[in-house]
């Protein structure tokens, strides 16, 4: 489903952004004026116009996405795919829970850090068992309670937790990664330099929509891989017109 600037701007009324599902805290209900929103939406619009509709996250079901979110820590997605392929028909929470940790380590070896990741997968699976491996039961938990709960699981940090919330369960928790930090520092948006600050900046300026967060993060990642690298390739970048890195060169 295509979501471009027009769809995002439809949430702007009388120079304010209205949440489709208002937050309990009044300060999140009537957010920032159009002038503070437009730079972020301009980035989204430029990326969307260039790359189109991207479909993320790769995975067949919520549990597979959760596994992928852990396996992708400190490695390339190609290595994750190799590890997932080695799990094959055993990639279910029931089978991972029953699998000896040594066997699991060997299966996920291509993903790197396989010993610690095997224990992280065991811990995550044990957490999921509390919900009888039922994704709908997880989704019924309020987000402000669910996120700290997931963060308490061994091996799950903020980026992994938000990836699980957003991609596995379809909940509106904006994912901040190295690509996001790099884009926002170079554009720049003055969003801050910490994970929490950047996440709050984005969530305060975008409609509270998992679909929009999903699309935006996917667009940032693909542009980060193609253009906004540590050593950027600015020619052809859809954001080069407003990028400080480009201006400085």
PLM features: what roles do these ranges have?
Residues 20-33:
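Short, contiguous pre-domain boundary segments
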Residues 37-249:
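Catalytic cores of DNA base-excision repair glycosylases
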């Amino acid at each position: 489903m295509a979501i471009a600037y027009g769809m995002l701007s439809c949430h702007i009324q009388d120079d304010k952004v209205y949440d489709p599902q208002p937050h309990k805290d009044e300060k999140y209900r009537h957010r920032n004026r159009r002038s503070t929103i437009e730079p972020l939406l301009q980035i989204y619009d430029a990326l969307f116009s260039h790359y189109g509709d991207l479909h993320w996250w790769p995975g067949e079901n919520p549990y597979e996405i959760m596994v992928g979110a852990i396996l992708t820590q400190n490695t390339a997605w190609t290595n994750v795919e190799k590890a997932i392929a080695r799990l094959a028909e055993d990639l279910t929470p029931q089978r991972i829970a029953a699998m000896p940790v040594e066997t699991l380590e060997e299966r996920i070896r291509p993903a790197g850090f396989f010993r610690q990741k095997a224990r992280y997968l065991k811990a995550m699976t044990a957490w999921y068992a509390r919900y009888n491996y039922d994704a709908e039961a997880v989704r019924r938990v309020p987000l402000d309670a669910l996120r700290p709960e997931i963060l308490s699981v061994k091996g799950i940090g903020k980026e992994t937790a938000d990836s699980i919330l957003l991609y596995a369960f379809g909940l509106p928790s904006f994912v901040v990664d190295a690509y996001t930090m790099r884009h926002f520092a170079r554009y720049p948006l003055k969003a801050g330099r910490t994970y929490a600050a950047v996440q709050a900046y984005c969530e305060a300026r975008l409609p509270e929509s998992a679909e929009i967060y999903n699309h935006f993060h996917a667009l940032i990642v693909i542009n980060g891989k193609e253009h906004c690298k540590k050593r950027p390739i600015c020619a052809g970048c859809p954001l080069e017109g407003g990028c400080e890195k480009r201006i400085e060169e």
